[in-house]
Amino acid sequence: MRRAAGSTSRFAAGLIAGTSRRGVAVGHGYARFDNDVLALTPRGAPRMPNGIETDVVLTVGEQLLIGDGQFCTASAILIAGPPWEARPSPRVALTIRPDANLAFDQLSGWGPGLTPLGDDILVGYTAAAALAGAPPTPAASWGDRTTALSRTLLALAALGELPEPAHRLLEDGNPQPLLRFGSTSGKGIIVGLAAAPASTATVCDGRFTVALSLPDGPQTFEVFLSEVEC
């Protein structure tokens, strides 16, 4: 019997509505369909721009089918649930000190993990450019040099779409959910967001620190929060 998933990102809804495709579960709640990676997150967990909320748990290597209006796993057939908007509406601008001076072309694929730290920084930087209406970053080129998951997230960041904890920072000025997101993923996204050219903003009304190990060695940044001018 088919059942509706929880909230569903634009990306996931597109996969479900699209042409039928076979895929495989790759672990940690991710399913790969060619170069597209879908995230399955339980209700209450941070939502992902490539995600769908569901209590379905995948087994590594499990064969999957998506498209023609449904997502078929070994244990369930899901249809898209209510839409979740993965593109935040920023009310907070970020600036960073000292200047990050990051060699962006060297960050793609740098670091361990499903989403290497370098890619997390690029996701934040790419999304910040998209949200500010700035010239686009070479996200597609960066994505060609890293994991399929990072490639998917970079493509979505180019549309301004980000994991839910980033919404809390950009919309509410609350950095804590993003600081707690993943081992270093959230911190990397913060540095990328703050390293992008800042929107016009009022005076600073908050700050916090982010410590990361970067290609040049450990660095500690201070991130300043300001209300975006309307």
Language-model features, listed with the residues they occupy:
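Short glycine/serine- and small hydrophobic-enriched flexible loop segments
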Residues: 126-131, 195-199
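Phosphate/adenylate-binding glycine loop and adjacent helical scaffold
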Residues: 1-122, 129-136, 140, 144-167, ...
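Helix-coil modules at protein/domain termini and other flexible surface or pore-lining loops
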Residues: 187, 194-203
